[in-house]
């Protein structure tokens, strides 16, 4: 019986459960005990977290020129938009860096006193036609900064309680992109496309509920500004025990984008460049360039609510791409489509080339379809599909040439065998 009594009175660590006989030291607190091993483990965890913060602080933050140069490698044209994005992103992460490293953002007063101020974040609105490079710009930014990146579509969002996706689902995508590392997610980038589709249906507030327009704008306000949001993991296997994941959006950069069809007319009416009445000249508004002319009142008239506009202080406009721009997109960027398909053909030991006229025809076709740069891959796939189907089964093919007729579907891409090339080489030698 004595042994039983002794075991009952034996003190144990409240954290690991080891008894005082199994550890070197047991420190007592108010109704709790902690052993030396648990203290050592706690110190290791704290040191590891401090090291991570220090390393993050010491990592060089890309300057606007470096961000711009990176975008130049991947995105053709849109110079003003690239400059605006580079500056906005640099200021955003400089603001975060100052907060993480414990720097005080202060403003010196007239009498030498310092008043601490809070620097608000600058979310970004991209305005540009379909296929002008809005999504690709955001993706390239995230790649340069090495931060989690999530893409969402505003058209699928509705107010909480209605059929559709809640705005919290956007945050869940970012958390998933960060592999459920909430600290990384809280410094990530969220890109929301088709933001113009959630404009309210009329300029005047309606008595009927607009659950996919103004209602979504209202729901987005808090996460755009910065709040601690509760996100349901929806069966996330890495956190099955948690009902909600809590993420602070204060340092999440939001880039929202849309085509804003019809905004050109609003800008023209404001600037007095659009005639009114039956005698006014008819002009295709799709050809009007509004770069650098968009003002908050234009967005308000389009259907965005004032509070939503106020949370998007940086507005960058993208121009419609020309045929020359499209040809450059096909050939110049690091991951240009022509380079990608040449690499695919090289893997089969075949050289792929394009006539200059063929490249122009592809660019014109993409513009005619109204799909912009994102339609280029579909056109190339359609042109090269017959060749790519037959190529793996043929060992005699040395080269493939895409001509203007091949783009127009008047002929297939020209195929040159090793024998044909050798015969041509001998003919040139004899000549």
Curated annotation (Swiss-Prot):
Tell me which SMART domains the record gives: AAA, ClpB_D2-small, zf-C4_ClpX
Keyword terms of this UniProt record: ATP-binding, Chaperone, Metal-binding, Nucleotide-binding, Zinc
Identify the residues that bind Zn(2+).
13, 16, 35, 38
What GO molecular function annotations does the UniProt record carry, in alphabetical order? ATP binding; ATP hydrolysis activity; ATP-dependent protein folding chaperone; protein dimerization activity; unfolded protein binding; zinc ion binding
What region holds the ClpX-type ZB domain?
1-54
GO terms for biological process, alphabetical = cell division; proteolysis involved in protein catabolic process
An annotated GO cellular component of this protein is:
HslUV protease complex
Matching entries from Pfam families are given as:
AAA_2 (PF07724), ClpB_D2-small (PF10431), zf-C4_ClpX (PF06689)
Extract the InterPro entries matched here. Answer: AAA+_ATPase (IPR003593), ATP-dep_Clp_protease_ClpX (IPR050052), ATPase_AAA_core (IPR003959), Clp_ATPase_C (IPR019489), Clp_protease_ATP-bd_su_ClpX (IPR004487), ClpX_bact (IPR046425), P-loop_NTPase (IPR027417), Znf_CppX_C4 (IPR010603)
Coiled coil spans: none
Provide the binding site for ATP: 129-136
Q: What the protein does?
A: ATP-dependent specificity component of the Clp protease. It directs the protease to specific substrates. Can perform chaperone functions in the absence of ClpP.
Question: Which HAMAP family does the record match to this protein?
Answer: ClpX (MF_00175)
Q: How does it assemble?
A: Component of the ClpX-ClpP complex. Forms a hexameric ring that, in the presence of ATP, binds to fourteen ClpP subunits assembled into a disk-like structure with a central cavity, resembling the structure of eukaryotic proteasomes.
Q: Which family does it belong to?
A: Belongs to the ClpX chaperone family.
- State the name under which the record lists this protein: ATP-dependent Clp protease ATP-binding subunit ClpX
The uppermost taxa in this organism's lineage are:
Bacteria, Bacillati, Actinomycetota, Actinomycetes, Micrococcales
Q: Which gene encodes it?
A: clpX
């Amino acid at each position: 019986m004595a042994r039983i009594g002794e075991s009952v009175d034996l003190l144990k660590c409240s954290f690991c459960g080891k008894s005082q006989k199994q550890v070197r030291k047991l420190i007592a607190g108010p109704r709790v005990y902690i052993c030396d091993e648990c203290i050592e483990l706690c110190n290791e965890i704290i040191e590891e977290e401090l090291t991570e913060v220090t390393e993050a602080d010491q990592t060089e933050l890309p300057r606007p020129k470096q961000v711009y140069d990176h975008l130049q490698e991947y995105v053709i044209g849109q110079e003003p938009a690239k400059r605006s994005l580079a500056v906005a992103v640099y200021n955003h992460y400089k603001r975060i860096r100052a907060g993480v490293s414990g720097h005080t953002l202060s403003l010196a007063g007239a009498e030498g006193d310092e008043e601490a101020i809070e620097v608000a974040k600058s979310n970004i609105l991209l305005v540009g036609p379909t296929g002008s490079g809005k999504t690709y710009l955001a993706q390239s930014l995230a790649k340069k900064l090495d931060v989690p990146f999530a893409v969402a579509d505003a058209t699928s969002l509705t107010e909480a309680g209605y059929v559709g996706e809640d705005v919290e689902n956007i945050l869940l995508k970012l958390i998933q992109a960060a592999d459920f590392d909430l600290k990384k997610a809280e410094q990530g980038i969220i890109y929301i496309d088709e933001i113009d589709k959630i404009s309210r249906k009329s300029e005047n507030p309606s008595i009927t509920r607009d659950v996919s327009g103004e209602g979504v704008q209202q729901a987005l306000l808090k996460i755009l500004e910065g709040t601690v949001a509760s996100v349901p993991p929806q069966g996330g296997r890495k956190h099955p025990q948690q009902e909600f994941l809590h993420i602070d959006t204060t340092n999440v950069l939001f880039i929202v984008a849309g085509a804003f069809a019809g905004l050109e007319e609003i800008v023209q009416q404001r600037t007095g460049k659009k005639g009114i009445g039956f005698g006014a000249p008819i002009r295709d508004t799709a050809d009007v360039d509004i770069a650098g002319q968009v003002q908050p009142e234009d967005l308000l008239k389009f259907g965005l609510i004032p509070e939503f506009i106020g949370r998007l202080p940086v507005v960058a406009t993208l121009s419609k791409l020309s045929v020359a721009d499209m040809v450059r997109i096909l050939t110049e960027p690091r991951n240009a489509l022509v380079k990608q398909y040449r690499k695919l053909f090289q893997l089969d030991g075949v050289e792929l080339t394009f006539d200059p006229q063929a490249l122009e025809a592809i660019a014109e076709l993409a513009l005619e379809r109204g799909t912009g740069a994102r339609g280029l891959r579909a056109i190339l796939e359609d042109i090269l599909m017959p060749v790519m189907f037959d190529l793996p089964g043929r060992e005699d093919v040395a080269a493939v040439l895409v001509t203007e007729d091949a783009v127009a579907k008047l002929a297939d891409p020209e195929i040159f065998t090793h024998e044909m090339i050798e015969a041509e080489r001998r003919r040139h030698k004899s000549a």
